[in-house]
Structures are given as structure tokens and as C-alpha cells.
From Swiss-Prot:
Residues annotated with Phosphoserine modification: S3, S35, S49, S102, S124, S138
Tissue: Red blood cells.
Source organism of this protein record: Felis catus
TM annotation in the entry: none
Subunit-level organization: Heterotetramer of two alpha chains and two beta chains.
Full protein name: Hemoglobin subunit alpha
Organismal lineage: Eukaryota, Metazoa, Chordata, Craniata, Vertebrata
Modified residues (Phosphothreonine): T108, T134, T137
Function: Involved in oxygen transport from the lung to the various peripheral tissues.
Biological process annotations from GO: cellular oxidant detoxification; hydrogen peroxide catabolic process
Residue positions, PTM Phosphotyrosine: Y24
């Protein structure tokens, strides 16, 4: 459960990301593909090379979904319902991949915002990404 402090930390951090959200989403995807090669199996139709337009576009989708989640932290299940359905029923993404992407998002944010990435912010973002992952995998059961 996200505390009031966690929500405040996440909103403040996400606010600083601003127009870079799509760029960071793409970078996190690239990190995920490099660090966890099995994740590539869900994107056989993508050009997965560095700077690929397809990876950038999907990175923007990830960022947009997270921006929506930040805006609706008090009701993630409703806000993420359609995305949960998509990943569970159509794409059938292995739930562990959300953890991999979450880790790579944390690394990406820490690289770009080291001064703001305090232990408290790190913990809050980790809890937030975990909450989003839990919602995205809730329909698997």
C-alpha cells in the first residue's frame, strides 16, 4: 500500500520527468531487452535495435500508461483495467517481465535524476511500480 509520503514522492518525481517520459520509457525497454533477453520474445515484429522507432513508440506507450497510473494512484485497478486485460488475455505476457521492466525503469530514472533519486524516492517508486505490476497481473488468476 502506498503511503501519503510515497504518493507525494512519486508525483514529485514524475513531475520532474515531464517531457522526457517517452524517452525514458524507451531507454528502460532497451535496458530490459539487453538485460533480460527473453523479454524480446514478445516483440518478434519489432526492430529492437538501439534507437528503433518501434521501441521509442512502445516506450511512449509505457510512459503514457505510467503517467495515467500516477494520476490515478488511488484507484489503479480501474485506471489500468484495459491494459491489464490486454496483457493478460491478448498478449499473455509472463508476469515476471513487469518486474524486469520496473527494475530497468528505476535504473533509468536513477541515471537521469541522481540528485532526486534519494533512498526514500527509490523506495516509493519501487512500491509504485510494484503496485502497477500487481494490477497488470491481477487478471491472470
Amino acid at each position: 500500500v502506498l503511503s501519503a509520503a510515497d504518493k507525494s514522492n512519486v508525483k514529485a518525481c514524475w513531475g520532474k520527468i515531464g517531457s522526457h517520459a517517452g524517452e525514458y520509457g524507451a531507454e528502460a525497454l532497451e535496458r530490459t531487452f539487453c538485460s533480460f533477453p527473453t523479454t524480446k520474445t514478445y516483440f518478434p515484429h519489432f526492430d529492437l535495435s538501439h534507437g528503433s522507432a518501434q521501441v521509442k513508440a512502445h516506450g511512449q506507450k509505457v510512459a503514457d500508461a505510467l503517467t495515467q497510473a500516477v494520476a490515478h494512484m488511488d484507484d489503479l485497478p480501474t485506471a489500468m483495467s484495459a491494459l491489464s486485460d490486454l496483457h493478460a488475455y491478448k498478449l499473455r505476457v509472463d508476469p515476471v517481465n513487469f518486474k524486469f521492466l520496473s527494475h530497468c525503469l528505476l535504473v533509468t530514472l536513477a541515471c537521469h535524476h541522481p540528485a532526486e533519486f534519494t533512498p526514500a524516492v527509490h523506495a516509493s517508486l519501487d512500491k509504485f511500480f510494484s503496485a502497477v505490476s500487481t494490477v497488470l497481473t491481477s487478471k491472470y488468476r
